[in-house]
Swiss-Prot record:
Species, as recorded: Lucilia cuprina
Tissue expression summary: Detected in the thoracic perisympathetic organs in larvae, and the dorsal ganglionic sheath in adults (at protein level).
Superkingdom, natural source: Eukaryota
Family: Belongs to the FARP (FMRFamide related peptide) family.
GO cellular component: extracellular region
The protein's name in its UniProt record: FMRFamide-19
Compartments (UniProt record): Secreted
Positions bearing Phenylalanine amide: 11
């Protein structure tokens, strides 16, 4: 989304 890093971290 806004931050690709956060998108991977939620998984």
């Amino acid at each position: 989304s806004a931050n690709a890093k956060n998108d991977f971290m939620r998984f």
